From Swiss-Prot:
It catalyses: 5,6-dihydrouridine(20) in tRNA + NADP(+) = uridine(20) in tRNA + NADPH + H(+); 5,6-dihydrouridine(20) in tRNA + NAD(+) = uridine(20) in tRNA + NADH + H(+); 5,6-dihydrouridine(20a) in tRNA + NADP(+) = uridine(20a) in tRNA + NADPH + H(+); 5,6-dihydrouridine(20a) in tRNA + NAD(+) = uridine(20a) in tRNA + NADH + H(+). PANTHER family: FMN-LINKED OXIDOREDUCTASES SUPERFAMILY PROTEIN (PTHR42907:SF1). Gene3D superfamilies: 1.20.120.1460, Aldolase class I (3.20.20.70). This is tRNA-dihydrouridine(20/20a) synthase. One of its GO terms (molecular function) is tRNA-dihydrouridine20 synthase activity. InterPro entries: Aldolase_TIM (IPR013785), DUS-like_FMN-bd (IPR035587), DUS_fam (IPR001269), DusA (IPR004653), tRNA_hU_synthase_CS (IPR018517).
Amino acid sequence: MRPEPTNAPAALSRRFSVAPMMDWTDRHCRFFLRQLSRHTLLYTEMVTTGALLHGDRQRFLRYDECEHPLALQLGGSVPAELAACARLAEEAGYDEVNLNVGCPSDRVQHNMIGACLMGHPALVADCVKAMLDAVEIAVTVKHRIGINGRDSYAELCDFVGQVREAGCRSFTVHARIAILEGLSPKENREVPPLRYEVAAQLKKDFPDLEIVLNGGIKTLEACREHLQTFDGVMLGREAYHNPYLLAAVDSQLFGSEAPPLSRSEALLRLRPYIERHQAEGGAMHHVTRHILGLAQGFPGSRRFRQLLSVDVHKAADPLRVFDQALELLAGR
């Protein structure tokens, strides 16, 4: 196998991705994760159509070129608005647009966004068709295996079937139902049981579709096992809290021969990015809040977290604090 060029972005593959996570997968987090893996598909936080069409569009769409392959996740349910936002994403250079049909929070439900849309498969199909008609880039859907009151396998197949008829070819399946009343988003990630067998049956019954599994996956060993059944795996919180897991993704899941980046090398690559962010008036903690898990499992990990989450706010020269944190990971 020939060595890969290290400067060119990898081709879009959904074999391994990091989930869209509110307040977490912002552009600074994605820049950091990209240092660890070239091939991982990265997703933005969910952006609502209203925010893009009526808010600070540049802020929501901004990213660094190194973040490719990169997908924008949209929240909305008005086909024309989603089509307009998909065009904005394509014009901004995103590789994919993903529709959120999985978020269970009350706040988004009131705006007909997220998991509640699983009860309206024809509307989701209309939304997907409008986006596909508007852009050349991929349009995908992330959804649950059901919602309370509509959680039979037949209803899941009806949902996927209608959205497939609209032209969608890639579905990311969070293998839990969403309970739309009485549970917080956090509880909705923990209380409904994981049912990988339902997602596996979906792949069996829709062999022509790309089915990516999401929910509760914590190790690359588990990823390899699931990839025997599914076309891809998506990690969420584990990738955020234990980011160095991504350093082995390219070799273990994509066959890359490039040596993995060390933790200290990842921090060194982050330093000029932080300097640029500060030069634009940004604060260092906007970036470093995303790297607190990098020292997980090492002596000094507590000090590392304290430096970057507490001391950084008191420092006259935050970069000096960053360099102290870097020293704790020297050679690792």
